[in-house]
């Protein structure tokens, strides 16, 4: 069984599965049965942490498509898994309801129905919309926790000031921000804040949208429909070429540890922080199992220090973050790096 970690009160496997790609974001999706089987196999090898969102599926299918798949795959083992999902809140729908709480609850009820459950373990605000008070969302999440409808809540793509204010209203279980060897911005403030305040940190795109696996090359053709990689600046040909030194570092350590590049990139962040639980995404069962296997790749302190020093000596070219951000102020933090 895989080692466990804590996201505040939630006990999860050290690595989770990002389920988005089964419905959204990385081009053509597998057959439904394949996706369901892949999630069940991940559970069988010890993964209990599955990440989805109400919006996944909206481009090719419909919002909720991914939650339905996760529900079909895992409702038979519901009590043994930790399900994380996310909501977006628009100002007009908040205005149409009597309160932020009512608006949040109506999203939650719809997600629970699709997931085939009567509670969600970890409910994230997917993006902060500056026209909707996040303080009121935080208070609403507290009420939902009190009612037993969610076990914990979180924020995604959040900066440290917003996080601290939200945490003061209702303690946050986990932050889900972009974090990988190519996107280390959260090391400055957000992750240290989370470590200090017993908040879990769940990196999304931990393999840098596949780049760190070494399998994406300048010849890789991204798909026409619903493939986020077409818009990820780090995956422009010039950046793929310029970031090769990072792949060389990974390749050295992969050889040393008899592991894959993707596994080393995950083992690195697990070693670095005790509260980090990455959710790599893949629509391919073998790769899902490979990524979960990174929990067994243990770096010694010395190996980690060498890896860290080698990474710090590399310049990262291009970034990904801003394409993931809708709110103005936090979005500008990423844009400055262009
Ligand atoms: N909170 C947010 O705003 C947010 C944003 C984005 C994502 N997420 C969540 O985070 C999860 C992970 O993020 P992500 O999918 O964007 O990025 P990721 O995990 O860094 O990368 C996914 C890409 O890498 C490839 N890949 C994965 N493992 C591989 C391996 N071992 N070898 C070779 N290629 C591999 C996948 O291809 P194949 O599918 O072909 O294997 C896919 O193209 C998502 O599933 C989603 O749940 C959250």
What are these regions (language model features)?
Residues 90-185, 189, 199:
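Glycine/proline-rich, positively charged
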